[in-house]
Amino acid sequence: MLKSISGGVGVASTERGGGGGGCGGGGAGGSASGSRSTSGSGRASCGLGSSSISSGLSAVCGFVTGASGGGGFERDRDRDRGLANISGGSTPAGILYCPACMAAANQQSPSQNSSPHHESFFLRSSFKSSKRNKARKSASTAGCLDAQHIRANLRMSMSSSMRSSRGNGGGGAASSSHPPGSSCSSGPGGSGCSMAYDAASNASSGSGSGSGKATSPGSYSCNALNVDFTSYTATHQWTRMLECAEFVGAKRSKHTVVAYKDAMFVFGGDNGKNMLNDLIRFGVKDKSWGRACATGTPPAPRYHHSAVVAGSSMFIFGGYTGDIHSNSNLTNKNDLFEYKFQSAMWVEWKFSGRQPVPRSAHGAAVYDNKMWIYAGYDGNARLNDMWTLNLTGENQWEEVDQLGDRPPTCCNFPVAVARDAMYVFSGQSGLQITNSLFEFHFKTRTWRRISNEPVLRGATSAPPSRRYGHTMVHHDRFLYVFGGSADSTLPNDLHCYDLDSQVWSVIQPEQNSDVPSGRVFHASAVICDAMYIFGGTVDNSVRRGDTYRFQFSSYPKCTLRDDFGKFFQDKQFCDIQFIVGAEEIRILAHIAFVAARSKYLRNKILAAREARQQQMEKVYGVGQVDALALNAGAGGDRGPMLEVRLANASPEAFEIILNYIYTDRIDLKDTYSKNIIILITDIYQLAGLFTMPRLAHGCIQYLDYKINKLNVLEALYNADKSNIKIIKDHCMQFIIKEENFTDVVMSSEFSDLDKPLLVEIIRKRLYPSKLVIDTSYEGNIGTTLEIDLCAFLESTGKDFCDISLVLEDHVIPAHKSVLSSRCTYFQGMFRSFMPPDNTVNIQIGEISPSLEAFHSLLRYIYYGETKMPPQDALYLFQAPCFYGLANNRLHAFCKYSLEHNITFENVLQTLEASDITKIYDIKEYALKLIVKDFAKVARLPKIAGLSRELLLEIIRAVADSHGEFLTRININTDI
């Protein structure tokens, strides 16, 4: 947590969860009970300075925050914005520099950085044992704080619980200031001095305040990393809970489930013989089933009704009632019942005026104290109308005037509410059933169909297949879809939709998960950070009464595509220029990204490089070429930029392809314009030329999605003219459809087509069976951004490396553009302090990581890989801060690795890494594990490579454990 440092006296508030203003203002510490909390603006940053800055750093920044003097800490005037200044003095207090300054310092003045009088505090944590922390509690100084006290007091928390990373960072972020003209600058998306620390990363809500996970006896607080080794449910873990006994509640389907506080309430449904109207309850804390107390008249037995929670009440609307055993009195309802949780009472609402028609299998949601009813089945037809009821006003229904791209009439679909919108996915729609996701924005009352085409959004997996009787819930920034009937199958995979990136993915469950069987007409609800599923129908119409729990995770989002896309748009550090089309339009890019994604363009770049080499040798002579090339590679302008000509390419199409190269997305504007169809045809041709099959596949998907009656003839004409058979066939297939043919033929553009095309359309219409769509391209949809960058890092990018990263005796070739796109540390270095020999010494704070750990970091930077052994995690959890990554996603996975992956097989590596990084709590845990499994650990080859000191510590730990064992034996013997 960000501990308080205020006034001229350094107060060491090290009590866990203790009080104190948050560093950077705006926050008070949590209670002293051990439950951590951070409140205030949500984001804060500190500008630290000292007048006694080493010459190397002062020459870089040319600025010191605060006035010289006592070296105390001084609150900024604008404290309500969450800013804090720490004024420097003659005493070397904590010094906070921007990534560029630190990069320069590490490269230019290593001796000064290592001096005890010039301790830089850029993103450093002091990893001391809990005993040492207790010894420092009483430490305070008057007038100045030395670097040791700074480290003890100011702990920059990058901690983010994997299940609770929802802080939005409400306040503005401060930045350490530099005067005009300083070489160290920060712009929107640049590096430089803007350093914001997420003070709400452990918050339980987006307000920037809340309570984090309480420190338990089995958990360890490693300053910037809180690791919990107590037993708990792993993320993405399916767990089978206690089944509901028959005497409590029958096995059922077509029921509803709602969550209220720490319980799940189940109402209605049918057991295969009778409809039900009982109300049963499952408590998630005591993990037990029981009947809920209820007074008043409950709703009649029913199924396919809806249930929502508003305030402290549950509302039941509509559904299908009657006697299914005798097949009598079967009817749909439009009644509304309220169940008040606090008084356990049923109340029926009465209405005057217009009401929704009776219905079942509809959707219901609550937003803005209103209940919203959508679609369903009225006994004769499916519906798509919408009604709303103010739950705090008069008992009056209002029909909603829906705008936008409305879904087709449907029933047996789920709804979920998130971000001022209601989401509807698939459902029964007869011939119109699709796997489309629709969004209804409550404030504008407008529908929007969300594109399912994965390549358009950069998705790595397809959306769920069309289905009905499934469930969908919202948690964090995701929608989760489970079960249902999908074309006569009952899948049990869990699909996830990311509301930020707008892509679908399939959740891979944790090993040893008890995954529920596929089912239909079940029900689900979210309680805290888990989804609970109850009941449903499985094979052969068998009703179930089982309950399953799925543990969510809330990792910070992967910013790989966003980082690369922004880097392309900013046009920083471009090292190649494409001259495109007859007009010779010049488009800047980066060699590394282009070479990674296209073999054709990679060969063009190598050929252009060879031609440039020969030209330079002609002009300057062989002896001068190497020096000029080095200057050009280092970012200087003394060497010519590489040029590649693409005379036959469309500049607009090529720019879109470049954006795809960086982001894996096809980003088109004005998507309903006729020119878009021509443009996508040009992109398809270039994708084939550049050997990018996934992009070509995306173009076909896009055409299927966007072709309509107004532009299909234009697309057909261009495909025929360009001899692109697959696009031509897709256009033909669209034209000859019964619902499209008449409108297309009667359009004015139809008569303008060439005679051979007209004849072909008529013949295809008369003999549609002869139209065969080539689907061979679907077997090879190419590689994703991650796969290409992985191959580029490991093999194909060796010829394009332009920077050397030195880690002790190891030289690791890399690519400046990739490093700069992801790390503000490297961005600032390459902009202002580029090493003349293209060599960068690697450290993370004061620690040199292991070679394996740094390779794990490179894999994360290049293609977002988060798998790592725990010993690598110990080195890397400071990396997001030190290197200026976009968020603390890597940090969260370091935490995950430490909590899940320490075993007797890697415990010695973990012990060694924790000793080097001085994370003594992890070291203590590793020693305990070694003692526990000493017979296995002692036979590992790694033990022979440990230092003498670590071997002695292991021997002492084993001896101590034997001493405790003998003591227990003596006590038992005496008794």
From Swiss-Prot:
Annotated pathway, please?
Protein modification; protein ubiquitination
Return the Kelch repeat spans.
263-312, 314-369, 370-417, 421-467, 478-524, 530-581
Q: In which tissues is it expressed?
A: Expressed in Rdl-expressing neurons of the mushroom body, the neurons projecting to the LC9 optic glomerulus and in a neuronal cluster near the subesophageal ganglion (at protein level).
- Give every BTB domain span: 574-670, 801-870
- GO biological process annotation, one example: negative regulation of Ras protein signal transduction
Consequence of gene disruption: Flies are viable but most wings show wing vein defects characterized by extra veins and vein tissue, which are caused by an increase of Ras-MAPK signaling. Decreases sleep with night-time sleep-fragmentation patterns, primarily during the second part of the night. RNAi-mediated knockdown in neurons of males results in reduced total sleep in combination with decreased locomotor activity, increased Ras-MAPK signaling and altered metabolism including reduced glycogen levels and increased levels of triglycerides.
**Gene Ontology cellular component terms for the protein in this record:** Golgi apparatus
Keyword set, alphabetical order: Kelch repeat, Repeat, Ubl conjugation pathway
> Where does the record place Low complexity bias?
174-186
Locations of Gly residues compositional bias?
A: 16-32
Region Disordered: start-end pairs: 16-41, 158-186
What InterPro entries has UniProt attached to this entry? BTB/POZ_dom, Kelch-typ_b-propeller, LZTR1/Attractin, SKP1/BTB/POZ_sf
Q: What does this protein do?
A: Inhibitor of Ras signaling. Acts as a substrate-specific adapter of a BCR (BTB-CUL3-RBX1) E3 ubiquitin-protein ligase complex that mediates ubiquitination of Ras. Together with Nf1, plays an important role for normal sleep behavior, mainly during the night. Might affect sleep by modulating GABA signaling in Rdl-expressing neurons. Might play a role in the regulation of brain glycogen metabolism and organismal levels of triglycerides.
- Describe, as the record does, how this protein assembles with itself and its partners: Component of some BCR (BTB-CUL3-RBX1) E3 ubiquitin-protein ligase complex.
Belongs to which family?
A: Belongs to the LZTR1 family.
**Per its record, how is this protein called by name?**
Leucine-zipper-like transcriptional regulator 1 homolog
Q: What species is given as this protein's source?
A: Drosophila melanogaster
Q: What is the lineage of its organism?
A: Eukaryota, Metazoa, Ecdysozoa, Arthropoda, Hexapoda
Q: Which gene encodes it?
A: Lztr1
